[in-house]
């Protein structure tokens, strides 16, 4: 159900008694505190985190391999051999995540929106580490001044988070939507 889609954030605060009184007042006014159900969901999710992260990695490697073969796409995923960040990734990391970027070359900007909007198994939005796959076309103004991207005037970024779905189904969905990239 929807219980898995909930976003939960937690933290702790270490303060002296004088400041704590102010924190209590602010907490009562705002209602910002973690309830027992939220704490339970966090604990339950942590129990399967390593298994889910392994599945994200396996699925994402398959998707990245598939997308790397497309002539109008540069996959921004350091796990892929031959990428400029692969050596650094190999030196410092043991695994990879479900997050990647696609640098897409286009003739018509609306083709990128059609690509993203035609995906059936991908939700639309920002997230990282959730169970569902997501896609998001990042507009130029959202990309900031990331000089390392070296985007030309006819390239945009689509951000993908690969979830826990069957990678064969995700590849089929991507394949059907890639026809819109012109």
What is the predicted role of each segment?
Residues 1-4:
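Short, small-residue-biased leader/transition segments that mark boundaries at the very start
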Residues 6-9, 95-97:
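Short, solvent-exposed loop/turn segments at the edges of secondary structure
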Residues 9-70, 114-119:
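Conserved core segment of the aminotransferase class I/II
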Residues 11-13, 75, 100, 135:
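Well-ordered beta-strand positions enriched in small/hydrophobic/aromatic, beta-favoring residues
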Residues 24-28, 74-79, 158:
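Beta-strand segments within the central parallel beta-sheet cores of soluble alpha/beta enzyme folds
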Residues 42-51, 98-106, 158-163:
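Short, well-ordered beta-strand elements within core beta-sheets of diverse protein domains
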Residues 61-120, 124-130, 143-149:
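Conserved small-domain helix->loop->beta segment predominantly found in fold-type I
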Residues 106-107, 118, 133-182:
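PLP-dependent enzyme catalytic core of the Aspartate aminotransferase-like
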């Amino acid at each position: 159900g929807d219980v898995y889609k909930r976003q939960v954030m937690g933290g702790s605060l270490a303060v002296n008694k004088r400041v704590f009184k102010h924190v209590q007042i602010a907490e009562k006014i705002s209602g910002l505190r973690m309830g027992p159900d939220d704490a339970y969901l966090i604990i339950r999710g942590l129990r399967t985190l390593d298994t889910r992260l392994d599945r994200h990695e396996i699925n994402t490697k398959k998707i990245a391999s598939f997308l790397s073969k497309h002539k109008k796409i540069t996959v921004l995923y350091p796990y892929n051999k031959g990428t400029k960040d692969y050596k650094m990734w190999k030196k410092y990391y043991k695994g990879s995540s479900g997050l990647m970027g696609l640098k897409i070359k286009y003739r018509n900007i609306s083709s990128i929106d059609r690509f993203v909007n035609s995906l059936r198994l991908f939700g639309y939005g920002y997230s990282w580490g959730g169970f569902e796959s997501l896609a998001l076309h990042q507009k130029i103004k959202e990309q900031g001044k990331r000089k390392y991207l070296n985007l030309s005037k006819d390239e945009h970024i689509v951000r993908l988070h690969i979830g826990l779905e069957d990678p064969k189904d995700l590849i089929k969905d991507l394949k059907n939507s890639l026809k819109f990239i012109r």
